[in-house]
Amino acid sequence: MASMLLAQRLACSFQHSYRLLVPGSRHISQAAAKVDVEFDYDGPLMKTEVPGPRSQELMKQLNIIQNAEAVHFFCNYEESRGNYLVDVDGNRMLDLYSQISSVPIGYSHPALLKLIQQPQNASMFVNRPALGILPPENFVEKLRQSLLSVAPKGMSQLITMACGSCSNENALKTIFMWYRSKERGQRGFSQEELETCMINQAPGCPDYSILSFMGAFHGRTMGCLATTHSKAIHKIDIPSFDWPIAPFPRLKYPLEEFVKENQQEEARCLEEVEDLIVKYRKKKKTVAGIIVEPIQSEGGDNHASDDFFRKLRDIARKHGCAFLVDEVQTGGGCTGKFWAHEHWGLDDPADVMTFSKKMMTGGFFHKEEFRPNAPYRIFNTWLGDPSKNLLLAEVINIIKREDLLNNAAHAGKALLTGLLDLQARYPQFISRVRGRGTFCSFDTPDDSIRNKLILIARNKGVVLGGCGDKSIRFRPTLVFRDHHAHLFLNIFSDILADFK
């Protein structure tokens, strides 16, 4: 079986390389030296349009129970492997979106399947404890093997959560408690504070604020939603807070041609940040913290320079604001470093950092001074899931053993180079190509063309994602290799050549 599979892959690789050399070929990508992911498929295999008939039937059934309009198609996860997602109609697609950037090392990784089959791990998957009061014996050990082994600089404290929204929500609460504790000093809670907090009034509920950026996405819970400014549909009809919103830089591309303009744009945004901090202090809505993504993701894959973030960090420190870096989507290795903020080169990059998605669990790291001063202040029933810490420990081992951070940088370079070639060939469809590692994207002329390209690509066997008003984003797994990039680029080149 193994030898037959290897032969099939070699044949596929030969055919793939051969067609790139055919005179007059409109494919732009060069064949890469193929480094196989052992549990991967050879390529896409399409049997129906997507969604196919089985998916459509299941969508109808689900729509009876809930609004299912967001569902793209139903999946067969038993058959999905590596970089390939298989749907219930038997269509096999190269997945460059990976469950909204949340699959770290591919579908059905053999090491993870082996892990869950080991008898000593069974109880961890069957029994989900309330970690805040009844953690299992090996909880600390597993945290050390998983999350604490990749802790950011200067952050020794860790609280686990279940998802990105609850990670950010509780991180915001932690910041507010830290700030009020600074103001309160050594004294305990006053009777007035204890009474007024119960009726949502000051001084028990101080009127602090969090500064966020236009285009940001930090989650859908109430506090997070007040800092989210990417799509109106996320926020409409929901009461919110009067918190400051700063502009995020809108860089011009190619970067090397617009150095001065981009520096001026970043300076403008930083000046506005400082102005808002002062303005809200005068309004008696003191800015307790600043929250920012290293790359704005849902809002359109908006980048800023490393220098912008270094200066933003300085502003937070100058004004006594906590600095919260949201690594929910950028964390876990996709930019070529485990945490995207590592690219900034700071010894003190943040006070608090949130994570989820590729980390398989949620939570946040923070400095010692942000540690809650009493139990139950940051708390919920589960506080994450220890089975996810078990899986994450193995994921981190694989990332290190297979050098997947360097792979993300290398494969990302292949992808970005190919996208730039496509941009040169089809400037009427592709602009503002940008990326860090495999965390790449480009703009289309409008959302109609963007959505049409995503649908065509899906029916050709490639899953892509949209973001912002008109961008297409790439969020492949960490086992995405150069040859996957070239495979996609050839498929997408065909699509653009025929696009009308």
Curated annotation (Swiss-Prot):
Effect of residue 321 to M/S/A/G/K: Loss of 4-aminobutyrate aminotransferase activity
Catalysed conversion reaction: 4-aminobutanoate + 2-oxoglutarate = succinate semialdehyde + L-glutamate; (S)-3-amino-2-methylpropanoate + 2-oxoglutarate = 2-methyl-3-oxopropanoate + L-glutamate
Entry's localization field: Mitochondrion matrix
Free-text remark on how the cofactor is bound: Binds 1 [2Fe-2S] cluster per homodimer.
EC nos: 2.6.1.19, 2.6.1.22
Top EC category: transferase
Sites bearing N6-succinyllysine, chain numbering: 231, 252, 413
PROSITE patterns: AA_TRANSFER_CLASS_3 (PS00600)
Protein name: 4-aminobutyrate aminotransferase, mitochondrial
Originating organism: Homo sapiens
Gene that this polypeptide is encoded by: ABAT
